From Swiss-Prot:
Cofactor note: May bind 1 zinc ion per subunit.
GO MF term list: ATP binding; metal ion binding; protein-exporting ATPase activity
UniProt xrefs under SMART domains: SecA_DEAD, SecA_PP_bind
Function in brief: Part of the Sec protein translocase complex. Interacts with the SecYEG preprotein conducting channel. Has a central role in coupling the hydrolysis of ATP to the transfer of proteins into and across the cell membrane, serving both as a receptor for the preprotein-SecB complex and as an ATP-driven molecular motor driving the stepwise translocation of polypeptide chains across the membrane.
Protein name, as recorded: Protein translocase subunit SecA
EC id: 7.4.2.8
Source organism: Rhizobium leguminosarum bv. trifolii (strain WSM2304)
Record PANTHER family: CHLOROPLAST PROTEIN-TRANSPORTING ATPASE (PTHR30612:SF0), SECA INNER MEMBRANE COMPONENT OF SEC PROTEIN SECRETION SYSTEM (PTHR30612)
C-alpha cells in the first residue's frame, strides 16, 4: 500500500529535491557565461578578484556576485588543476555558501567543491577557515587547492601541529586558512590565556567549512578540548587502589555496557570500605561520606579501568605508555589522555609509569567553538542520519547532492552467524574467493584486536598477500588506502582509517607518481615513466571493473548507521560498480547488548546448524532499529551535555570578553577604582547591618577587614563612638582614606608603571580565579545528578548554583585585586625569573584526527609583592610565592607543602 507521503513525493519530489532544484537557475547562469570566462587571459581572470572586492566595497553582497565568482573559480580550477567542477559540484558549493551541510558521496570531489564558496567568502577580507580532521589532509588540501587561490591572487595558510605563534599568526592572516579542528580550538583557548593582544594568533571567526562534518560536530561533540597543567604525583595512591579491584567478585559491582558505567553493589562497597580502612585511606565510617569524595573518584576509575576498558580495543600499551585508540577509526592517538584520573587508573592497571594528573586551565567543546562562527557549513558523505542533531544544535540543514553518475554498488543483506568463529571462517572464504577472481577487497573491522585476529587466520591458511591498516601502522595509511583498488588487493582496515583518501580502482595515479618518481627530475624520462604508470593504471582499472569493482566486507555492525554507511561508501565511487556485505555473529557487541539471547533461541528453533548463516531483510531491519535506539540515546546525551556546557560557555564568553577589553586597554584606573568602591560597600554592609543601632555595629570586624583588604589601620572603633555618626559617614571616611593611600602610591609609581601594575594584577587574578571556578563547576557537575532523587531538576539546580559561583568569582576578583593593589610595592632589585607552568593542550577521547597533541609553555609576567606587605592571615595579599619559598602564613613550611598544596587540589 502506497502512503499519501509516498504519492506526494512522486508528484512533487522530496524537500531535498526541491532544495536542489532551487539552485538550478544559478547553475544555468554560471554555465551561460562559461565561454565568456574561458576567453579571458590568465591576467584578466586573476584581476576578477580585485573587481569583485571593489563591488563589495560599493555595497554589493556576496550573493550578488556569486554567479561570476563561481564561474571564475571553475575556470581557474580547469586551468590550474585540470579539473572542471561538474554542475552537481556547483550545487554543492551553493549549499555550503547558504549555511548548510552538503552530503556528497565518496569520490564526488568535496575538496574541489569547497573552493567555490571558499573563494567567494574570502573576498570579504574577513578570512575563511577550511577545517579537516588531521594535519595530513590540511597540508594536502592547502597545497593542492592553494594553487587555485594563488592563481586568483589570494593567500593560503595552513595550521598544523608544531608551528610557532609567529607562523600561526601569519597563517590566520591569510585569505584562506586550512587547519584541523583541534588546532583551531587550542589556538582559541591559548589566545585567551595571553597577556598582550599582539600575542594572539586568531583574528576572528567569520566563515568555516568543516570537512567530514559528522566526525567533528557529532562524534567529537562529547569530548572537550582542554588545556591543563600537571598536579602533584599521586602514583602510590593509584597503585594501592588498583590492587583492590582484582579482589572483588562479579556480585561486588554492576556493569552497564550500554551506558559505559560501572558501580559498586552494597556488598562490594562494604568489602571496599574494609580494604580502604586497612590501608588507612578511609576517613569517617562510610565510603560515601563527604570527606571521601576524592577516594570515591579513585575507586570508580579503577573499577572502570578493569571492567569497561579493554586492552587492544580502547587502548594499547606501547613504550611503557597507555595510548588511546580512536573508537571510530582505530588510530592510535599518542599524547591524548583521558581526564579526571581515568588515564592514571589505566596506567596503574597495566603496571606502567603513572603520569601526573592534570588540572583544567581552559576548555571548550567543539559544539560551542564552532557555534562562534558567523557562518558555518560542512561536507561529508554521511549526514542524513544525524540531520536532526545538526538542525537542533548547529542550525544546519543537511542537503543531499545528487551524484554526477548513478551509484552501481550492490548492498547485500547481512549474513548472521551464531559465533565469532563461524563468522570469521565465512569471511576468510569470501576474501579468498574474491581474490581468486581478481576483485579488490576492503575488510572493515571495529578494533585492532579484530583486524589482527583476521590477519592471523589468513596467514594460517597460508595466505599473506594482504595489507593490515590499523592504529599500529598508520604512517603509511593514506598510500595503503589509495592502492586498495588494485585488482586482487586485500586491505584489512580498522573502521574508517584513511578517511579523506579515495580508493580508486586500479590505484591512485598521483600517489604512485610521487612515490615512484619523487626523485626523478622533470624531463623526457620522467614524462615517459609517468605515461607508463598511466597506462598501467588504466589496465589495472579495467581488470578491477571486470571483477566487479571494490568489494567491501564488514566484520561487524557499528552502533551508528552512519559509520556503517561510511564503510559502504568506499565502494562504487563515481559510477564504478561495487559490492558490500556485513558479516555478523550473535557474539558481536551490538548483537550481544541488544537481545542476542532471543535471536539465538529463535535461530535454534529454526534448526540453524553450525557454519550456516541466516540472511533475511528482517534481520537488517531489526539491526537498524537497534542502531536507531543507540543513535537516539547518544543524541540525547550530547543534547544534555550541551545544556550543561552552555552554562559554562556563557560565563566563558563574559570572562574572555573582559580579558580582551583589558588587553586592549592601556589605562584601567577607572575599573580598579570601581572595584575599590564596591569592596568598601561590601565591607560596610557586612559589618554594619541595615537599620542597626551604632552599638550593634561590628566595629572590630570592620577594622580587621580594612586592615586585611585595604592595608589600612584606621581608628574605626573610635569613629563609631562619635555622636551622630552614621553608616554613610563611615563609608565616606573609609573611601577617603583608601583613595588617599592609593593616590599616594600611584604618584610614587608614576602613571605608566601604575597602569601596567593594575592591568597585570587584574588579569593574573582573573585567570587564577577563573581556573579555580572551572574546577568548582566540574565538581558541581559530577554530583548535581543526585538532586534528581530529591525531585529537583538537576539542570536548573546546576544553573542556579553555577550563577552563585560566578557571582562569588566576581566578588572575590574585586576583593583580591583591591587587596593586592593596596599592598603592592616596587622592589629595587630585578626579580628572579618565575618558573613558567607547563601547560598541555589535549582533546579527551576524540573520535578522529591524529598527531595533534600540542604542548605549550607560557609565562605570565608577575608583579612582585614585598614580603613585608604580606598579611599572614590573608593569602590574597601574598602575590606570587615561589614553590620553594617559606609559606607567608608563618607555619615555617615550604609554600608547596603548605598553602601551595591547596592550589593543586
Amino acid at each position: 500500500m502506497v502512503s499519501f507521503g509516498g504519492i506526494a513525493r512522486k508528484l512533487f519530489g522530496s524537500s531535498n529535491d526541491r532544495r536542489v532544484r532551487s539552485f538550478q537557475p544559478n547553475v544555468a547562469a554560471i554555465n551561460s557565461i562559461e565561454e565568456k570566462t574561458k576567453a579571458l587571459t590568465d591576467e584578466q581572470l586573476a584581476a576578477k578578484t580585485v573587481e569583485f572586492r571593489a563591488l563589495l566595497a560599493e555595497g554589493k553582497t556576496l550573493d550578488d556576485i556569486l554567479i561570476p565568482a563561481f564561474a571564475v573559480v571553475r575556470e581557474a580550477s580547469r586551468r590550474v588543476l585540470g579539473l572542471r567542477p561538474f554542475d552537481v559540484q556547483l550545487v554543492g558549493g551553493m549549499i555550503l555558501h547558504s549555511n548548510a551541510i552538503a552530503e556528497m558521496k565518496t569520490g564526488e570531489g568535496k575538496t574541489l567543491v569547497a573552493t567555490l564558496p571558499v573563494y567567494l567568502n574570502a573576498l570579504s577580507g574577513k578570512g575563511v577557515h577550511v577545517v579537516t580532521v588531521n594535519d595530513y589532509l590540511a597540508q594536502r588540501d592547502a597545497a593542492t587547492m592553494g594553487r587555485v587561490y594563488s592563481f586568483l591572487g589570494m593567500t593560503t595558510g595552513v595550521i598544523v601541529h608544531g608551528l610557532s605563534d609567529e607562523e600561526r599568526h601569519a597563517a590566520y592572516a591569510c585569505d584562506i586558512t586550512y587547519a584541523t579542528n583541534n588546532e583551531l580550538g587550542f589556538d582559541y583557548l591559548r589566545d585567551n590565556m595571553k597577556y598582550e593582544k599582539n600575542q594572539m594568533v586568531q583574528r576572528g571567526h567569520n566563515f568555516a567549512i568543516v570537512d567530514e562534518v559528522d566526525s567533528i560536530l557529532v562524534d567529537e561533540a562529547r569530548t572537550p578540548l582542554i588545556i591543563s597543567g600537571p598536579l602533584d604525583d599521586r602514583s602510590e595512591l593509584y597503585n594501592t587502589i588498583d590492587a583492590f579491584i582484582p579482589l572483588l567478585v562479579p556480585s561486588d559491582y554492576e556493569i552497564d555496557e550500554k551506558q559505559r558505567s560501572a558501580n559498586f553493589s552494597e556488598e562490594g562497597t562494604e568489602k571496599l570500605e574494609n580494604l580502604l580502612r586497612q590501608a588507612g585511606l578511609l576517613k569517617g565510617n562510610a565510603l560515601y561520606d563527604i570527606e571521601n569524595v576524592a577516594i570515591v573518584h579513585h575507586v570508580n576509575n579503577a573499577l572502570k579501568a578493569h571492567k569497561l576498558f579493554q586492552r587492544d580495543k580502547d587502548y594499547i600499551v606501547r613504550n611503557d605508555e597507555v595510548v588511546i585508540i580512536d573508537e571510530f577509526t582505530g588510530r592510535m592517538m599518542p599524547g591524548r589522555r583521558y581526564s579526571e584520573g581515568q588515564h592514571q587508573a589505566l596506567e596503574a592497571k597495566e603496571r606502567v609509569q603513572i603520569q601526573p594528573e592534570n588540572q583544567t586551565l581552559a576548555s571548550i567543546t567543539f559544539q560551542n567553538y564552532f557555534r562562534m562562527y558567523a557562518k558555518l557549513a560542512g561536507m561529508t558523505g554521511t549526514a542524513q542520519t544525524e540531520a536532526e542533531e545538526f538542525a537542533n544544535i548547529y542550525n544546519l540543514d543537511v542537503i543531499e547532492v545528487p551524484t554526477n553518475l548513478p551509484i552501481k554498488r550492490i548492498d547485500e543483506d547481512d549474513e548472521v552467524y551464531r559465533t565469532f568463529d563461524e563468522k570469521f571462517k565465512a569471511i576468510i572464504e569470501e576474501i579468498l574467493d574474491a581474490h581468486k577472481r581478481g576483485q579488490p577487497v576492503l575488510v572493515g573491522t571495529t578494533s585492532i584486536e579484530k583486524s589482527e585476529l583476521l590477519a592471523e587466520r589468513l596467514r594460517k591458511q597460508g595466505f599473506d598477500d594482504f595489507q593490515v591498516l590499523n592504529a599500529r601502522y598508520h604512517e603509511q595509511e593514506a598510500y595503503i588506502v589509495a592502492q586498495a583498488g588494485v585488482p586482487g588487493a586485500i586491505t584489512i582496515a580498522t573502521n574508517m582509517a584513511g578517511r579523506g583518501t579515495d580508493i580508486q580502482l586500479g590505484g591512485n595515479l598521483d600517489m604512485r607518481i610521487e612515490r615512484e618518481l619523487g626523485e626523478v627530475e622533470a624531463g623526457p624520462e620522467r614524462e615517459a615513466r609517468i605515461q607508463a604508470i598511466v597506462e598501467e593504471i588504466k589496465e589495472l582499472k579495467q581488470k578491477a571493473l571486470a571483477a566487479g569493482g571494490l568489494y567491501v566486507i564488514a566484520t561487524e555492525r557499528h552502533e551508528s548507521r552512519r559509520i556503517d554507511n561510511q564503510l559502504r561508501g568506499r565502494s562504487g565511487r563515481q559510477g564504478d560498480p561495487g559490492r558490500s556485505k556485513f558479516y555478523l555473529s550473535l557474539q558481536d557487541d551490538l548483537m550481544r547488548i541488544f537481545g542476542s539471547d532471543r535471536m539465538d533461541s529463535m535461530l535454534t528453533k529454526l534448526g540453524l546448524k553450525e557454519g550456516e548463516a541466516i540472511v533475511h531483510p528482517w534481520i537488517n531491519k531489526a539491526l537498524e532499529r537497534a542502531q536507531k535506539k543507540v543513535e537516539a540515546r547518544n543524541f540525547d546525551i550530547r543534547k544534555n551535555l550541551l545544556k550543561y556546557d552552555d552554562v559554562l560557555n556563557d560565563q566563558r564568553k563574559v570572562i574572555f570578553e573582559q580579558r580582551l577589553e583589558l588587553m586592549e586597554s592601556t589605562n584601567i584606573s577607572e575599573t580598579v577604582s570601581d572595584m575599590r568602591r564596591e569592596v568598601i560597600e561590601d565591607l560596610v554592609d557586612k559589618h554594619i547591618p541595615e537599620r542597626a543601632y551604632a552599638e550593634q555595629w561590628d566595629a572590630a570586624g570592620l577594622k580587621t577587614g580594612a586592615l586585611n583588604i585595604l592595608n589600612l589601620d584606621l581608628p574605626i572603633e573610635d569613629w563609631v563612638k562619635e555622636e551622630g555618626i552614621g553608616e554613610d559617614d563611615i563609608r565616606e571616611r573609609l573611601t577617603q582614606a583608601t583613595n588617599a593611600a592609593f593616590t599616594e602610591k600611584a604618584e610614587r609609581f608614576g602613571d605608566d608603571i601604575m597602569h601596567y601594575v593594575e592591568r597585570s594584577i587584574v588579569m593574573q587574578t582573573l585567570d587564577h580565579l577563573w581556573r579555580e571556578h572551572i574546577v568548582n563547576l566540574d565538581h558541581l557537575r559530577s554530583v548535581i545528578g543526585f538532586r534528581g532523587y530529591a525531585q529537583r531538576d538537576p539542570l536548573q539546580e546546576y544553573k542556579s548554583e553555577a550563577f552563585e559561583l560566578f557571582t562569588s568569582l566576581l566578588n572575590n576578583l574585586r576583593e583580591a585585586v583591591t587587596a593586592q593593589l593596596m599592598r603592592v610595592e616596587l622592589v629595587q632589585q630585578a626579580p628572579a625569573e618565575p618558573e613558567p607552568p607547563l601547560m598541555q593542550a589535549h582533546h579527551l577521547d576524540p573520535t578522529t584526527g591524529e598527531d595533534d597533541f600540542a604542548p605549550a609553555i607560557y609565562q605570565a609576567s608577575e608583579v612582585i609583592v614585598s614580603p613585608e606587605n604580606r598579611n599572614p592571615d590573608d593569602p590574597a595579599t601574598w602575590g606570587k610565592v615561589g614553590r620553594n619559598e617559606t609559606c607567608p602564613c608563618g607555619s615555617g613550611k615550604k609554600y608547596k607543602h603548605c598553602h601551595g598544596a591547596f592550589e593543586q587540589v
